[in-house]
Amino acid sequence: MITGKIVQIIGAVVDVEFSQQSVPKIFNALKVDNQGSILILEVQQQLGSGIVRTIAMGSSNGLKRGLLVVDLEHGIKVPVGTATLGRIVNVLGQPIDMKGPLKNHDNSDIEYWEIHRKAPSYSEQLTSYEVLETGIKVIDLICPFSKGGKVGLFGGAGVGKTVNMMELIRNIATEHSGYSVFTGVGERTREGNDFYHEMSDSRVLDKVSLVYGQMNEPPGNRLRVAFTGLTIAEKFRNEGHDVLLFIDNIYRYTLAGTEVSALLGRIPSAVGYQPTLSEEMGVLQERITSTNKGSITSIQAVYVPADDLTDPSPATTFSHLDSTITLSRQIVSLGIYPAIDPLNSTSRQLDPRIVGQLHYDVALGVRSILQRYQELKDIIAILGMDELSEDDKILVSRARKIQKFLSQPFFVAEIFTGFSGKYVKLQDTINGFKDIIEGKVDHVPEQAFYMVGSINEVIEKSKKL
């Protein structure tokens, strides 16, 4: 047993001295008894003379110099497999849902994996062109997801990232038979609680593993909790399952890295972020991939500070994604939810060879009408609608109907909106927007398109107006 002693404590950073012959490796887990409770430290730096600098995976309150520290001689290990399904665990894999210890259904031994693992090699990786239906019109039409791909939900504060994330989980987890892993990185405890009950009410909790590191936790927890969730997802993938990995919020992972970097004494780079921002993001994102054994489809919420998409944190995330969904405050102000901006949202899947020519043409038609409407808005604001040509008047009418039709009542928001949730099949979505573009519903009033599912519901609603 290799032991050392604490020589310095600065908040979440703890320096530990070992003999020079037995200095722990980087990322090794150390154990210290802090007034009867076990605290885990993770080695971040070797300072020389046998001293290592560590980050505490919990509160450092109560620690003092001279306390005995034990090197566990491996990285942080967490439980993986079916024992985690339906349970909430923390960064160390310890259950925090007050349901007792984790156990496998067949009472077999629980397997433990280290959270620091190598990304799959190039020869093991697999790409898929299969489109994953979400039941949300604007996503399925404009920025379709690929099975085994990575999706980012970008948005500032209060534009609906978490609600969109919860709706996606509810829709995909209900329709999709595989396992899901939800990782809450530095988010509100209330949202975690809401999410747990939403999964329970939707009867999909027994297929979901929940890993939480809330915003009141020390930076070490928030920095590593994404790896805990990813490790659980990797286990399911390696067993041949198609896994959904939800991360809310990837920005908090970056922020925790910034805090840890400052505590470790590194000189900050642009906008105060850590100099290792790209590397830290890459280490996480490179492991989120599909292999010849199974797939991981990842959906990540990304907070955009001050609605600035050029901020280094969201900008670094962009390069790793297959689909980007941008939430717009301007669309929120129009009362249209989900507030997804169809002109700023993209997907590599929107290709006629993948989604088919009809889907591609309809998506492009919707975009071009909305783009032209955007250009005409200034003329309308200054001169009014009367100055537009007849063709432009028709185009504006269709654009406003498209805008309204892009709204959709969510299952997870029923309690707030009063509208019952709708799941819209991809074919119904394409047919609905095709009818608007071709002018088949020009006679239907604009209000009928708001907060409905398919185009048939629009016709029914218009009869009541």
From Swiss-Prot:
Keyword Ion transport: yes
Compartment(s) of residence: Cell membrane
InterPro entries (alphabetical): AAA+_ATPase, ATP-synt_VA_C, ATP_synth_F1_bsu, ATPase_a/bsu_AS, ATPase_alpha/beta_chains, ATPase_F1/V1/A1_a/bsu_N, ATPase_F1/V1/A1_a/bsu_N_sf, ATPase_F1/V1/A1_a/bsu_nucl-bd
Keywords from the UniProt entry: ATP synthesis, ATP-binding, Cell membrane, CF(1), Hydrogen ion transport, Ion transport, Membrane, Nucleotide-binding, Translocase, Transport
Binding residues for ATP: G155, G156, A157, G158, V159, G160, K161, T162
GO MF, one example: ATP binding
Bilayer topology annotation: Peripheral membrane protein
Span of the signal peptide: none
Documented EC number(s): 7.1.2.2
Cysteines paired by S-S bonds: none
Reaction catalyzed: ATP + H2O + 4 H(+)(in) = ADP + phosphate + 5 H(+)(out)
Keyword DNA-binding carried by entry: no
EC class (word): translocase
GO cellular component: plasma membrane; proton-transporting ATP synthase complex
UniProt cross-references to CDD domains, sorted A to Z: ATP-synt_F1_beta_C, ATP-synt_F1_beta_N, F1-ATPase_beta_CD
General function of this protein: Produces ATP from ADP in the presence of a proton gradient across the membrane. The catalytic sites are hosted primarily by the beta subunits.
Subunit structure: F-type ATPases have 2 components, CF(1) - the catalytic core - and CF(0) - the membrane proton channel. CF(1) has five subunits: alpha(3), beta(3), gamma(1), delta(1), epsilon(1). CF(0) has three main subunits: a(1), b(2) and c(9-12). The alpha and beta chains form an alternating ring which encloses part of the gamma chain. CF(1) is attached to CF(0) by a central stalk formed by the gamma and epsilon chains, while a peripheral stalk is formed by the delta and b chains.
Family: Belongs to the ATPase alpha/beta chains family.
Name assigned to this protein: ATP synthase subunit beta
Organism the protein comes from: Buchnera aphidicola subsp. Baizongia pistaciae (strain Bp)
